[in-house]
Amino acid sequence: MTLDATLAADIDAVCRLTGQFTLRSGQQATEYFDKYLFEADPQLLLRVAREMVGLLPDGTDLLGGLELGGVPIATMVSSLTGRPALYVRKKAKEYGTCKLAEGPDVAGRRVTLIEDVITTGGAVRDATRALRAAGAEVDVVVCAIDRSPAGEHPLADVGLEVRPVLTKAELDAAREAGA
């Protein structure tokens, strides 16, 4: 639960769009949640990052921003905390350094993942496994919005704790309260 009383309503107002949209599944929808709109708004991004600071576990050495949406958030949280950030690609580069994670070496360090939205956790799961294989300790992901169904823990299979700033239920409640 966020300490910023209007954050859910403000994000919902900016990101929930109405119109005709084709979803990733190919289905048609009249409503769409465009998460990049809060990340592109410097004031909303700062408010989300401030909330995330309080959710970081003690002993975090590095902030791992997941491509693409976690990168601007991790950068802002890094700026607020002074902790270094690294940027975790979906796939390692095939040229240059051929790295999956750009930034400081992760071996022997505690990495807290930073993500914008978690629904099924696929990208977070892949990043967790890759970082652990590189020697990192990864136990927590802090996300702006947890859209997984209530009561489900999509990352329990990899032993990852999800610490959200907001949940889908909180966004829906903010919308209903303002309607």
Swiss-Prot record:
Alphabetized GO MF terms: magnesium ion binding; orotate phosphoribosyltransferase activity
CDD domains assigned to the protein according to its UniProt record, in alphabetical order: PRTases_typeI
Keyword presence, GTP-binding: no
Keywords, comma-separated and alphabetical: Glycosyltransferase, Magnesium, Pyrimidine biosynthesis, Transferase
Class in the EC hierarchy, top level: transferase
SUPFAM superfamilies given in the database record: PRTase-like
Binding-site residues for 5-phospho-alpha-D-ribose 1-diphosphate, renumbered to this chain: R24, R89, K90, K93, E115, D116, V117, I118, T119, T120, G121, G122, A123
The EC number(s) this enzyme carries: 2.4.2.10
Domain of life, per lineage: Bacteria
Reaction it catalyzes: orotidine 5'-phosphate + diphosphate = orotate + 5-phospho-alpha-D-ribose 1-diphosphate
Alphabetical list of Pfam families matching this protein: Pribosyltran
Biological processes annotated in GO: 'de novo' UMP biosynthetic process; pyrimidine nucleobase biosynthetic process
Cofactor: Mg(2+)
Function: Catalyzes the transfer of a ribosyl phosphate group from 5-phosphoribose 1-diphosphate to orotate, leading to the formation of orotidine monophosphate (OMP).
Sequence similarity: Belongs to the purine/pyrimidine phosphoribosyltransferase family. PyrE subfamily.
Subunit structure: Homodimer.
Protein's name according to its UniProt entry: Orotate phosphoribosyltransferase
